[in-house]
């Protein structure tokens, strides 16, 4: 059974493990340019975990940690948040866990946090992630052109029905 639960300090090393042996582009792809810098460290994770309007979650498959996903920019006035820094360990990819995790996070956001809208960014080249997000009900809303076209990205959105 898949569950999405709030991260605890004992989980911080998991993020390091899932990035072990990966390069700077890998970190940039899943974490973006602002929060974590290569190489990712416990200090960076601790600092980020304490940020207001943000929540890091661990994805569990039968109590085994297989990934992490975050809600940030949680806004109780606009009833919205942004999904970001979504990572699955290598042996959990291509098994449907990403879609299941997103559906769990959507339930948390809408039922527990009282939100109505979620957004996320995804790089245009990341077809596997785009398909995962679409399976969970997200729609492409906007294209963003960057100077380095490799990092062009979409905004995707999920609204409460």
Predicted regions and their residues:
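Extreme N-terminal starter segment of soluble prokaryotic enzymes
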Residues: 1-3
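Acetyl-CoA-dependent GNAT
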Residues: 6-12, 16-93, 104-108, 112-113, ...
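C-terminal "cap" of GNAT-fold acetyltransferases
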Residues: 81, 116-130, 135-161
